[in-house]
Amino acid sequence: MRPEFIHLRTQSSYSFLESALTIEKVVELASSNKMPAICLADKGNLFGSLEFALCAVKKGLQPIHGVILNIKYDIDIFAQILLIAKDETGYKNLLKLSSLTFTKNDRKICDHIDFEDLIEYQEGLIGLCCYTDGIVGKCLLARNEEQAMLFARKLQEILGDRFYFEIMRHELPEEQFIEDSYIRIAAELAIPLVATNKVLFSEKSMHDAHDVLLCISAGVTKEYLDRKTVSENCYFKSPHEMIELFSDLPSAIQNTVNLRERCYFAAHANPPMLPNFATENISETDLIKKDAKEGLLARLATKFKSENIALENQEALKTEYFARLNYELDIICNMNFAGYFLIVSDFIKWSKKEGILVGPGRGSGAGSVVAWSLLITDLDPIKFGLLFERFLNPERISMPDFDIDFCQERREEVINYVRSKYGNNRVGQIITFGKMQAKAVIKDVARVLSLPYKFADYLTELVPFSAVNPVSLEQAMREVPELANAAKGNGLYNLDGEAELIKLVIDTSLILEGLHRHSSTHAAGIVIAGTDLVDIVPVYKDANSDMLIVGYSMKYSEIAGLIKFDFLGLQTLTVITDCKKLLKEQGIEVDFNNMTFDDNKTYQMLCKGKGVGVFQFESIGMKDALRRLKPDSIHDLIALGALYRPGPMENIPTYIACKHKLQQPDYLHELLQPILEETYGVVIYQEQVQRIAQVLAGYTLGAADLLRRAMGKKIKKEMEEQEEIFVKGAIANNISESQAKSIFATVAKFAGYGFNKAHAASYGVISYQTAYLKANYPAAFLVACLNLELNNHDKINLFLQEAKDNGIKIIAPNINISEGYFSVKFSDTVIPHSVKPVIPRLDRGIQKISKDTVVKPRCDIAGAIIFALGAIKGVTPNFGKLVTDERKARGAFKSITDFIERLPPKSINSKLLENLIKSGCFDELHDNRLQLLSSIPKLLSYSTAYHEEQESNQFSLIKVSSLSPTILVSSDYADKNTLAFYEFEAMGLFISNHPLTEYQEIFSRLNILNTADLHNNLPDGTNRVNLAGVIQKKDSRMSARGRFVTLVLSDPENIFELSIFSEEVLKDYVHLLDVKSLVVVNCDIVKDEGGIKLTAKSFSSIEDAINNKQFELQFYPQNHEELRQIVTLLAARINNEDQSNAKATIYLQSADVKNFVAKITLPEKFLLQGQDFEILKGYSK
């Protein structure tokens, strides 16, 4: 049956924040309405075109490719046109035109093409004049029919019979205003009319939710009237509705069908399109063979020298390595992948030549001898027992995939090299699309609907966070009853008056969730093509970059024929680079190229579980595993990196027990001992599964890789087929059927979690390198770690704690010592563990420094880590450099006014100055932080006045100097706790004083432990403890058991984390769980191989914990002065009301009568605070 109507103006969510339809929904709507075809015409881009085509074809629909573009007709005349691809030429021109809208240099007004662009790329395109948004409609709305006719003729001249007048009926006044004139011009010029309807949502009832989407786009609330809106009729109308709507213009309906019949191209998959690496003189095949053989000779020469291999053994090794090399080369060349290897080898060789650190390998590519020979990887595959077939299987053809790790700071240099070599038009990044996920969509919708912030924050906090698998709103409502109840008016807050609005927020969020919100770029993916990218895919260019971005997501870029190369920036390589640079400045060279992995100091450190900063070994559980494993070889580190994952983790105890000869390894069969010996009988690696199948059942390594894949996927049919092959092969090898089946079942269980050994070995080497640096050069290593985490105050806290544990001094921020980044001062003297962090004095005893005083460092900074100015909130490393350069040029700062006078006023603002003061940067220059904070407005005014006078020719030293004494306002001194929280606000950590320090004496009386007690002094069998801490961070997360909250707290010794799984605990103590709260928590404690786990059961404030306890204090003064101090303090704390928490007895020793002690029980009651116990502890018991 001939179709009745085809929608030609359907937009998807790739029209960012304009359409509420996904590609799948568009196709589903067309299919359910029995349309044989559907046109996708997104606003300004073709980002969804390939996804749309494949989805439509899969559903048996004809995809029609269109795009809505802005055309610049004149200097200030812009209008829309809908262009549709008639054939392949048209589609390629559509790619070029849509790409031009992003790659032009004049995008200030809007993304557009020029009229001349349409003339150049019109072939194969059908054009629809976009009614009221098109040039003809705009002219008619301006009552200029003559100009409308002129532009209609121009477009008709360009497109001929491929030009249509689009007509819509959304019941809008502007449409009705121009309709008659519009139809008349179409008739006069014989331009066919085509009926369309804007399709932005699926049904009329979605109009309100779509309106919210438009508000999100505009950044306004629904109450704001002067904003963009669309008609409620912009939904997917059925053919019947459209026919009825245009019953007076049946030809306009018929033309949708006619237009569809003119289109016969759909975007499709393409074979890989790589640049040709061949030259006139040599083919890719010959070139890779030549380079690989030369490279292997060089690798073996280095190997023989570094490993002291005897001359008589070298020839046999050469034979073995070259046999493997030739085997791999045959496969690579037969698969036509020589060019791929040569491209990767080229940019890695360039990187190494330029001194850019490249990872030893990543993924299965490290299993290739060819890759090793071409310098793509740095692991000897034969030495480490790695398999080529795991990377490139001759029995299952698929593209090889090298993921390359580069030093994070220099990754861009490598990309720029590739662009210069192959051409800017052939190299591009890959686009990614940010979606409206649960937390974000609730916040957006709540803001648009004017839901009070506290309710929006409450709702988003109920949605668990998962970085790997974001939780959908629907899933969150199933798993968090409180979220589902919130819409009904129930929850932690009193929702009276807001229940209906909250329900509307959640309902609307459910509709909008998952739509595309914006575009970004893939973190690592780079494509390199053999032709201009725009010939294959739409391209995009960010306004802030000149590099092309492929307009398809990674999945569809590869389907289109583009080959992705992952240029990954690995932060750890930057740590290694920076650490080696610091050491080189001290004349210390570290060469990892010839490392033998046998440094005792490194393994001794790891055996103690000191994994902070060590690649892969930083988690609590991993550190505990290191302590139990006691690694003594690189193979232990490789195995542990592979085992420490859900599933294989259960085999860690077996591995450890067998290593320490507490248990006999089970090799399953004597033939398998050589394969499983290095892992003590535990099947850890996927390569072991392949070897087992080869040795036991006669598989080729390629076929064994297919077996491994089947075991990993656990597809029943494939597993049954593979088991039959395995058993048959094992029987042929004189193994009984029952034993073969048993071994297959055992291996299948392990294989489901098997890890790629090539990847494990590559990353194990990086782990060893970082451990080596930390063990041998801890200060330089930790500074390198710190400098990559300037904005991560949790990490800074962690690394500084590690430095303190390693006896490294910490210099608090100091405007005359600190630089933009953390820095280290080396010393020949070993700093003992007992050394405490160097901190500024915070009392009134600091000497005030006048403007003329020569400032000297307040401590010996040799062997210390100096806190970075750039790690203070609101302060950038660039500002730190400005300060450092000024110090180098004109010496140390002598006062706060000297600082103000010497730095440009534009570089200093109120927040920056506030945080510099709060962090203690000026403590050496001025002893009263509170006074400086109160004086900020005057300091800034002084800065402006001083520099204005300097810039004028009327600068008066006397006049400005007369201002100086009046800058600082009078102020009291802040107490220690206030100063501590100043530091927390400025740096996210407590560096010179912790708020709980003064409570340590009373905590001992209250049986409240500190974190050091958890590791050292906890009696066996303890399962419940009381801890005190300051809440530093609060997160809501999701586990298999549902939502839970994690708190990060700190005490004077360390930071610690605890979990809250009970909704009742959350509800009862929500008022105590704010960041910066001082709390006592009663919690369950579990010690296992994952480390220490704390689960909160109840909370109390510090004050309540103290005040709810009655203390019986006994004092033993040794002289009159001590007695006077006791009595003075107690007199100030008399409180005979119910709030009291202490009684006191004083024992006086007679000076005349031996062994005579007078006991005086005071009748009064006292209300003591935390600091009181600290003061009195020297006199009491």
Swiss-Prot record:
Subunit and partners: DNA polymerase III contains a core (composed of alpha, epsilon and theta chains) that associates with a tau subunit. This core dimerizes to form the PolIII' complex. PolIII' associates with the gamma complex (composed of gamma, delta, delta', psi and chi chains) and with the beta chain to form the complete DNA polymerase III complex.
Source organism phylogeny: Bacteria, Pseudomonadati, Pseudomonadota, Alphaproteobacteria, Rickettsiales
GN (gene name): dnaE
Keywords: Cytoplasm, DNA replication, DNA-directed DNA polymerase, Nucleotidyltransferase, Transferase
Organism of provenance: Rickettsia conorii (strain ATCC VR-613 / Malish 7)
CDD domains named in the record: DnaE_OBF, PHP_PolIIIA_DnaE1
The name this protein goes by in its record: DNA polymerase III subunit alpha
Subcellular localization(s) per the UniProt record: Cytoplasm
Family in the record: Belongs to the DNA polymerase type-C family. DnaE subfamily.
EC annotation from Swiss-Prot or TrEMBL: 2.7.7.7
Function: DNA polymerase III is a complex, multichain enzyme responsible for most of the replicative synthesis in bacteria. This DNA polymerase also exhibits 3' to 5' exonuclease activity. The alpha chain is the DNA polymerase.
Reactions accelerated catalytically: DNA(n) + a 2'-deoxyribonucleoside 5'-triphosphate = DNA(n+1) + diphosphate
